[in-house]
């Protein structure tokens, strides 16, 4: 069974280097023009590689240091690196799409204890020693809780932990008010209830 144009395009989406795209087209004649079929950039681009993807309409920015192009047919940007909720609010009207929005300690102090539904992660120390916090609802959009996120939230008596969360930070529930109740959830790692990293290797 031979791969067709659509199949090879799907496969090449997972290439990590521009040379892989070039070698594909040079090595297999019938796949020449593969890069021209892309309407988004599957990898970060520089001044040279940008010319090989002439039909991009949606530009993906994978790392903060990536070169950004604004010419041609590009009308939308998709940002993959972590962006604070504050920055997201500042720039969301610019036809951008943010894949990893972090609710930081600064955001929490500015916008309050209610976690916005756009948020994908809770930053390090986000609710650190927030002793006034009694209940918290974590949206299902959240997939990560940072280190010491709810550290010593002594008044916290109710928290929902959605199954969407796949990454828990060290000490994120250390000495919070409902620590014993959270410990009953066996899917949550023990290091979430330790204060320091070195406690793991004692």
Task: Specify the residue positions occupied by each region the protein language model found.
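Long, charge-patterned amphipathic interaction tracts in eukaryotic proteins
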Residues: 46-53, 64
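Structural signature of tandem-repeat unit edges
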Residues: 20-25, 39-48, 78-121, 131-144, ...
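Intrinsically disordered, low-complexity regulatory domains of metazoan transcription factors
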Residues: 65-67, 73
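N-terminal export/assembly leaders
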Residues: 18, 33-38, 53
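N-terminal Skp1-binding subsegment of the F-box domain
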Residues: 1-30
């Amino acid at each position: 069974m031979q791969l067709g144009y659509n199949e090879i395009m799907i496969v090449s989406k997972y290439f990590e280097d521009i040379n892989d795209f070039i070698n594909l087209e040079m090595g297999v004649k019938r796949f020449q023009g593969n890069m021209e079929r892309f309407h988004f950039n599957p990898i970060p681009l520089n001044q040279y590689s940008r010319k090989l993807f002439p039909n991009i309409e949606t530009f993906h920015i994978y790392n903060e240091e990536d070169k950004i192009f604004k010419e041609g047919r590009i009308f939308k940007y998709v940002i993959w690196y972590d962006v604070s909720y504050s920055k997201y609010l500042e720039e969301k009207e610019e036809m951008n799409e943010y894949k990893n929005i972090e609710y930081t300690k600064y955001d929490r102090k500015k916008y309050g204890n209610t976690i916005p539904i756009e948020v994908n992660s809770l930053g390090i120390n986000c609710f650190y020693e927030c002793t006034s916090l009694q209940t918290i609802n974590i949206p299902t959009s959240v997939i990560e809780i940072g280190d010491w996120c709810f550290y010593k939230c002594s008044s916290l008596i109710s928290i929902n932990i959605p199954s969407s969360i796949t990454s828990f930070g060290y000490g994120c529930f250390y000495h919070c008010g409902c620590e014993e109740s959270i410990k009953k959830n066996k899917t949550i790692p023990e290091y979430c209830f330790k204060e320091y990293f070195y406690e793991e290797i004692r």
